[in-house]
């Protein structure tokens, strides 16, 4: 069994892949849904994802978890790989430091975005833009599930290579 098959099995065992009619965050609908909260709170899934992501990064990389779903993934991967991470908020908070990027980030630092699910890719692109505005160099994004609905292409338009652990096809073809 491949690493992809193992992860698909873990996602299904956590009941993270559901079928029915679902409204998605971008306003579209889908006959299936991948519940990030179920796979991100399942220790077997989270551990497998962190190990797979850690294998795909260099030791001098900083990770950036896209709030909310990318944060536990970035934290687990950073712990697994022994690298730092920052949090990319959807918008700057209106209190405290009012930062959009939380954590230590040096100018020119190489950052890899970590995201749970890519549908259109817009959330990841927004995080990339915020990180670049903060001085980071961002060329890669690690995604757990690529729904194969344009996310890879949108990220590529912004100069970011997407690496997904599983695709919608992997999830839907598995029985």
From Swiss-Prot:
UniProt KW NADP keyword: no
InterPro entries on file: OPRT, Or_phspho_trans_dom, PRibTrfase_dom, PRTase-like
Catalytic activity: orotidine 5'-phosphate + diphosphate = orotate + 5-phospho-alpha-D-ribose 1-diphosphate
Keyword Electron transport carried by entry: no
Top-rank EC class of the record's enzyme: transferase
Annotated binding of 5-phospho-alpha-D-ribose 1-diphosphate, by residue: 89-90, 93, 115-123
SS bonds (residue pairs): none
Pathway(s) annotated for this protein in UniProt: Pyrimidine metabolism; UMP biosynthesis via de novo pathway; UMP from orotate: step 1/2
EC number: 2.4.2.10
Binding site for orotate: 119, 147
Keyword entries, A-Z: Glycosyltransferase, Magnesium, Pyrimidine biosynthesis, Transferase
Gene Ontology biological process terms in this record: 'de novo' UMP biosynthetic process; pyrimidine nucleobase biosynthetic process; UMP biosynthetic process
Annotated GO MF terms: magnesium ion binding; orotate phosphoribosyltransferase activity
Xref: HAMAP family: PyrE
Subunit structure and binding partners: Homodimer.
Protein task: Catalyzes the transfer of a ribosyl phosphate group from 5-phosphoribose 1-diphosphate to orotate, leading to the formation of orotidine monophosphate (OMP).
Family as reported in the entry's similarity comment: Belongs to the purine/pyrimidine phosphoribosyltransferase family. PyrE subfamily.
Protein name listed in UniProt: Orotate phosphoribosyltransferase
Protein species of origin: Halobacterium salinarum (strain ATCC 700922 / JCM 11081 / NRC-1) (Halobacterium halobium)
């Amino acid at each position: 069994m491949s690493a992809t098959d193992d992860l698909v099995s873990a996602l299904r065992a956590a009941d993270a892949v559901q079928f029915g009619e679902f409204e998605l965050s971008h306003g579209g609908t889908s006959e299936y849904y991948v519940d990030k909260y179920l796979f991100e709170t399942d220790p077997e899934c989270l551990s497998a994802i962190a190990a797979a992501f850690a294998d795909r990064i260099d030791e001098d990389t900083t990770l950036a978890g896209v709030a909310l779903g990318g944060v536990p993934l970035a934290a687990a991967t950073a712990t697994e790989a022994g690298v730092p991470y920052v949090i990319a908020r959807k918008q700057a908070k209106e209190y405290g430091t009012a930062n959009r990027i939380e954590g230590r980030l040096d100018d020119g630092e190489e950052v890899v975005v970590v995201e749970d699910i890519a549908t259109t890719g817009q959330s990841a692109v927004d995080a990339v833009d915020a990180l670049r505005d903060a001085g980071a160099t961002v060329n890669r994004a690690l995604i757990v599930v690529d729904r194969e609905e344009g996310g890879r292409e949108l990220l590529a338009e912004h100069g970011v290579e997407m690496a997904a652990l599983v695709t919608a096809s992997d999830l839907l073809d598995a029985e």
